[in-house]
Amino acid sequence: VCAQACDSFYIDTAYGFPFFQFFTEELPRVVQALFASSPLREDNFVVGFAMGGNGALSFALRKPDFFSAAVNLSGGIGCMVDEFNYSQQMKEVPMPRLRHAFGYPNRNAVEPDHLFKLATQLCQTPHILPSLYIAVGENDFIRNTVRRERDALQRAGLPFHYEEAPGLGHEWKFWDIYFKKALEEWLPLKRKPIY
């Protein structure tokens, strides 16, 4: 299921739009009601491209009891694990939509969306760690940001799988290849009816 995030960065925004709640509570209930789908943690995954990649990572780290795995493809803005990435984007990225979602740089009320502390805490309860898969194109303009995110996950002690795609950038050519790879190789899909 692909749903519109309206430049919310997949969080409950600073000014009243609860997108994190929508994606992690409301949408799963709708999916369960409309489609033959499993409510079990082991059968629930989240995948995102670009801003959605950071959203996917955030969902899995904040709701590890519901999402067993997350795939972050080219995620380089929004919810961040790396403290430097997070503070720099809040100060320097000239995007009104970023401010509309997170609030202004001096606003510290978005603590749940700063993921390093959460990632570190999750390592203390390894029985609920989600499987994490991160990939970025070698020529992606946000590759260095993604590398800092990778390094922050390592510092936090979270296990994950990381790949860089040679010759590819922030583009559908990369996402098509790696979304297929996620479905065929990374995610533990059962590939059988659940009804």
Residues covered by each model-derived region:
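Non-catalytic cap/lid and distal C-terminal segments of serine-dependent acyl enzymes
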Residues: V1-Y195
